[in-house]
Amino acid sequence: MSAIRATNLSKRYGGTTAVSDLSFDVEPGQVTGFLGPNGAGKSTTMRMILGLDRPSGGSVLVDGRPYGELRHPLRKVGALLDAKAVHGGRSAYNHLLAIAQSNGIPAGRVNEVLDAVGLREVARRRVGGFSLGMSQRLGIAAALLGDPEILIFDEPVNGLDPDGILWIRTFMRKLAAEGRTVFVSSHLMSEMAQTADHLIVIGKGRLIADTSVQEFIGRSSQGYVRIRSPRLAEVAELVKVGELYPDHLRVTAMNTLEIGTLTARAGIPLEELTFVQPSLEAAYMELTKDSLEFSS
């Protein structure tokens, strides 16, 4: 059984449709990246999963039932939607203790999750003085309090420095390796390429792709050979295929050996002859170009 299942999920706010007929499954034991341009409906979808917004149509189930019907929701699902949605005057320890006590979770679990996210030494400090990275760690600690099987993170690496991003990436991979379900939204394609096993991509509230990372990249984009030369126009005329840019030529129909042989025979010097691998970012931009809320 899928950990999360959305079926024909829709959400309308007045005359605006935020999510439209969206169906997907999120499976355990892997990190599933949830991608889409600003305004695509990612946060709205996560809120419906967690019972914070009521769907206008369709349904979404968590472990086979609506979130509101879970007997002990925090023991089944942990979520981080807004790292700063915390009372700034409370200490990290007291913030977590209040959540634990209101959900029937033993107080001893607070120190366990503080240790897990590396905040034990600052547990008595007021949250209002925390950096964004520390706040993100505290939010993850709160999500882990009930030792849940399913974790939902909305943009957990936004605004973090490289060390913070690396920590969250490693931590999410660890959670998935334990057999948990990790469902995470992000705008950082390079990060998702290193973190996610599977991708669900939406645009304007509709499903665009539901596939593995490698299948997504291979299906949506292809590699190319990048050529730089002081005689670039001659190279373009020689190969007769490719896209000519001001400072380089892109060729997809020939490999580096073929191009190198041709240009050597013609006596044309090359400054660069490189095969550029397809990337998640390039595939994402190609697939979502018609779903951008704003574009230049």
For each feature predicted by the language model, list its residue ranges.
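Solvent-exposed beta-strand sheet faces enriched in polar/charged residues
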Residues: T7, R228, T274-V276
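Residues at or immediately flanking beta-strands
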Residues: S59, Y224, P269-E272
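A generic structural signal for secondary-structure junctions
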Residues: Q101-G104, V213, G218-S221, K240, ...
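Alpha-helix C-terminal capping segments
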Residues: Y67-G68, L74, I99-G104, I227, ...
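ABC transporter nucleotide-binding domain
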Residues: R169-M254
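Small side chains
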Residues: A6, G33, G242, G260-T263
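C-terminal coupling/interaction segments
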Residues: N255-S296
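ABC transporter nucleotide-binding domains
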Residues: S2-A6, K11-V184, M189-G203, A209
